[in-house]
UniProtKB/Swiss-Prot annotation:
One cellular component (GO) term of this entry: membrane
Listed PANTHER family: SMALL INTEGRAL MEMBRANE PROTEIN 7
Organism, scientific name: Rattus norvegicus (Rat)
Family listed: Belongs to the SMIM7 family.
Record-given protein name: Small integral membrane protein 7
Originating gene: Smim7
Compartments where located: Membrane
Topological domain spans for side Extracellular: 18-53
Secretion signal, residue range per the UniProt entry: 1-17
Keywords assigned by UniProt, alphabetized: Membrane, Signal, Transmembrane, Transmembrane helix
Transmembrane segments: 54-74
Membrane topology: Single-pass type I membrane protein
Length: 75
């Protein structure tokens, strides 16, 4: 059960890190524009952009998970 949850989280993190979309921040149109609460789409975009910066740590996590799957969860 724990191995399945760790594997699911690892695969989900990998999928987010390797997305190759052109995600850009929305530009402000003028000086008078009031700041608004970021939408859900903006939050998802920021999260995916931040995952790109952590690719090396995600790769190290993948190696760690492979070792755990062999040592701990292997039969």
């Amino acid at each position: 059960m724990i191995g399945d949850i760790l594997l699911f989280g690892t695969l989900l993190m990998n999928a987010g890190a390797v997305l190759n979309f052109k995600l850009k921040k929305k530009d402000t149109q003028g000086f008078g524009e009031e700041s608004r609460e970021p939408s859900t789409g903006d939050n998802i975009r920021e999260f995916l952009l931040s995952l790109r910066y952590f690719r090396i740590f995600i790769a190290l996590w993948n190696v760690f998970m492979m070792l755990c799957m062999i040592v701990l969860f292997g039969s």
